[in-house]
Amino acid sequence: MSVSFENTATNRGVVTFTIGQDKIQPALDQAFNKIKKNLNVPGFRKGHIPRAVFNQKFGEEALYDDALNAILPAAYEAAIAELGLDVVAQPKIDVKSIGKGQDWTLTAEVVTKPEVKLGAYKDLEVSVEVSKEVTDEEVDAKLENERKNLAELIVKDGAAEYGDTVVIDFVGSVDGVEFDGGKGENHSLELGSGQFIPGFEDQLVGAKSGDEVEVKVTFPEDYQATDLAGKAAVFVTKVNEVKAKEVPALDDELAKDLDDEVDTLDELKAKYRKELEAAKEIAFDDAVEGAALDLAVENAEIVELPAEMVENEVHRAMNEFMGNLQRQGISPEMYFQITGTTQEDLRKQYEADSDKRVKTNLVIEAVAAAEGFDATDEEIQKEINDLAAEYNMEVSQVSELLSPEMLKHDIAMKKAVEVITSSAKVK
């Protein structure tokens, strides 16, 4: 195989490669055997036309597309490997010369991985705003949140206050005309929860059971139902009941209700403190890792990041997110409906920092290469076992999905991150 590379711009070039007759002829034979099965030619049984008759009647070039499709992927990969190129996007293939009895010549416009010149990545001094210390106030706040979760709603006679729940019937109208979705009966609404559009809940504060209130609001300009966006509406609202939260007493009985492994409130507080300390330790380590990686990227020099790499990262991140949702039984349609967003909104969210993620990955890869990191068979098997447990899959399934090279790459990346973060010093 003849192979050459012409650099056309930063991280871009054209690969020219030839495919020899030793690969072409078997591919033509395979293409002929595939095509002739469905041929009906007068004078011959279906699928039994001789090769010479086929060439005379249709021409050998009728086989070229199938033959080229069969041998192109391997030929292209061999050309890239021979040149030692690290291609980061789908190539644009063009056939330059193809014909009977000659080698076929093709070109591939490729985008290559940018060069990374590492700066300092060890013993970095970083600042983080996350504290590992757990205060008494934080323990009390967690306890109070858990206590509120056990609160019961008790019907009250007085006026509704923020935090109370009102049970209401309502009918909404715009310019005196009722609209779809604007009606409800016996709907429970916690005042101050922000469940309804801005201004609605505020106008029910002070209402009592049996009151009828005309709630006047304006739909937000970005309201999901575009036919209502920006319009003024009136909701005739009847208050059926007002309920207040009644929280249990802060005592040992509460502690036992919240956690059957403790007997006293002090024991529960001690347990909550340990849980908060563990969570803060993780948050602190994550913050140090993020700060150290950011600084390592800042210290490095990356020669012009190809737009294709950023676009690939957006697609990868979105597909990973959607895959995680589907593993939880949530379809994309369901997610967008629940969140009131669109696929384009999600795309913009991932576009916002995709450039940074690509640069970070490039620097981590460069560190792994500089440190000569590899992975042993034992490390690869452990990675497979860990992934199988994380995603509730069979070990064999993970082995089929991920090649040893992919796993080696991931393990080397983890080692590189560990080198960067473990040596970092917090100011």
UniProtKB/Swiss-Prot annotation:
Keyword hit for Transmembrane helix? no
Q: What does this protein do?
A: Involved in protein export. Acts as a chaperone by maintaining the newly synthesized protein in an open conformation. Functions as a peptidyl-prolyl cis-trans isomerase.
Report the catalytic activity.
[protein]-peptidylproline (omega=180) = [protein]-peptidylproline (omega=0)
Record GO cellular component, one term? cytoplasm
Q: Know the name of this protein?
A: Trigger factor
Q: Subcellular location, in the record's words?
A: Cytoplasm
PANTHER family per UniProt: TRIGGER FACTOR CHAPERONE AND PEPTIDYL-PROLYL CIS/TRANS ISOMERASE (PTHR30560), TRIGGER FACTOR-LIKE PROTEIN TIG, CHLOROPLASTIC (PTHR30560:SF3)
GO terms, biological process: 'de novo' cotranslational protein folding; cell division; chaperone-mediated protein folding; protein transport; protein unfolding
InterPro entries (alphabetical):
PPIase_dom_sf, PPIase_FKBP_dom, Trig_fac, Trigger_fac_C, Trigger_fac_C_sf, Trigger_fac_ribosome-bd_bac, Trigger_fac_ribosome-bd_sf, Trigger_fact/SurA_dom_sf
Q: Which organism is it from?
A: Streptococcus thermophilus (strain ATCC BAA-250 / LMG 18311)
Free-text note regarding domains: Consists of 3 domains; the N-terminus binds the ribosome, the middle domain has PPIase activity, while the C-terminus has intrinsic chaperone activity on its own.
Q: What is its EC number?
A: 5.2.1.8
